[in-house]
From Swiss-Prot:
Gene from which the chain derives: hoxc10a
Alphabetical list of SMART domains matching this protein: HOX
Lineage of the species this protein comes from: Eukaryota, Metazoa, Chordata, Craniata, Vertebrata
Gene source species: Takifugu rubripes
A single GO cellular-component term on record: nucleus
Name of the molecule in the record: Homeobox protein Hox-C10a
PROSITE patterns per record: HOMEOBOX_1, HOMEOBOX_2
Stretch list, region Disordered: 199-223
Keyword set, alphabetical order: Developmental protein, DNA-binding, Homeobox, Nucleus, Transcription, Transcription regulation
DNA-binding region (UniProt annotation): 272-331
Pfam families xref list: Homeodomain (PF00046)
Length: 346
């Protein structure tokens, strides 16, 4: 019979008859392993585990070395009920397809340190299916399969009948490698974490957009308030300036008119009319100084003064004539006042 290219598959039909593990009969010739007896465990469940002799040289009295049973078959005709040391293997079972049995000498198979679990042999007569030895591949091929978290362990159960708490294993069974489901759990946790992070990022983006919109609205409102305040302030300033100007125009003009009527101004006469030939202060000052120094000007001096104060020769000549006439008028008025005072005393 052909066998697939797998070092872990071998024929177990010739090995099913023989010794029993309950009677302390070993499996193969391996000086590095020994089997604990049922009397040592204290219950009907028997646990097989690798124990190097280099680390445990003192072998217990109830244990039997595998090296003492070189010609014993590998498995017994009626396997006892073996259960794993942890409760997780009772709850989580791995279901897989049985491979076709292959025939090659079992002596060429390399011994490995693993645990084998068997079911009660009372129900072995119910079925005639052949038991195969299967080592499963990694969990990444079947993420939907759940496995126990125990490496190097093998569990035997029936592929046709469902497992119960009281009936753990079937007689026609498969040896399956129990791996860990860390990768599937990590994938699920990573997907959950990615979805949660995506939701958090979306919430943060929404909050930021809402905050930005609120800040922009607040800035717009502040800008509008500032503009309205500025316009109101400008309107108040303009109204205040207009009120001041109106007051100055109303009250100031009347005050100026009354004062000009009594005293007069250098631009206006006593009557309030505007003078016909107004001069600037600088021009009148220069002409007054020159008139006090000399009431009559020569032609050369008149030209010099007109050039210095930016006036024409004729304007300077007319101003001097008017000033002399004014001086004569003032002298005559003063003389008349003096004569009137003298006459009053008489």
């Amino acid at each position: 019979m052909s066998c697939p290219n797998n070092s872990g598959n071998f024929l177990m039909d010739p090995l099913m008859g023989g010794s029993s593990s309950f009677r302390d009969e070993g499996y193969s010739s391996n000086s590095g392993m020994y089997i604990h007896t049922a009397a040592e465990c204290g219950y009907s469940v028997m646990k097989v585990e690798p124990s190097p002799l280099s680390k445990s040289r003192d072998v217990p009295a109830g244990s039997v070395l595998l090296s003492s049973f070189q010609d014993a078959p590998y498995l017994s005709a009626q396997p006892s009920t073996w259960t794993p040391g942890t409760k997780s293997s009772r709850d989580q079972q791995l279901v897989a397809q049985c491979l076709q049995p292959c025939s090659f000498p079992a002596g060429n198979v390399k011994e490995e340190a693993f645990c084998c679990f068997y079911q009660d042999g009372s129900k072995r007569k119910q079925t005639t299916e052949s038991a195969t030895y299967i080592r499963l591949r990694d969990n990444r091929c079947g993420p939907e399969q759940t496995t126990t978290q125990a490496r190097g362990c093998f569990q035997m159960y029936n592929r046709e009948e469902p497992q119960q708490d009281d009936q753990l294993f079937a007689p026609a069974c498969s040896l399956l490698h129990l791996g860990t489901s860390v990768e599937s759990q990590s994938k699920i946790s990573c997907s959950k974490f990615a979805t949660e992070t995506g939701k958090d990022e979306r919430k943060e983006e929404k909050a930021r957009s809402d905050g930005c919109s609120e800040t922009s609205d607040n800035e717009e409102l502040k800008g509008r308030n500032l503009q309205s305040q500025r316009t109101l302030f400008l309107c108040l300033n303009v109204s205040a300036i207009l009120l001041r100007n109106s007051r100055v125009l109303v009250f100031g003009n009347s005050h100026d008119a009354s004062s000009e009527k009594t005293t007069g101004n250098w631009l206006k006469a006593k009557s309030g009319r505007k003078k016909r030939c107004p001069y600037t202060k600088h021009q009148t000052l220069e002409l007054e100084k020159e008139f006090l120094f000399n009431m009559y000007l020569s032609r050369e001096r008149r030209l010099e003064i007109s050039r210095s104060i930016n006036l024409t020769d004729r304007q300077v000549k007319i101003w001097f004539q008017n000033r002399r006439m004014k001086l004569k008028k003032l002298n005559r008025e003063s003389r008349e006042r003096e004569q009137g005072v003298v006459y009053n005393y008489c």
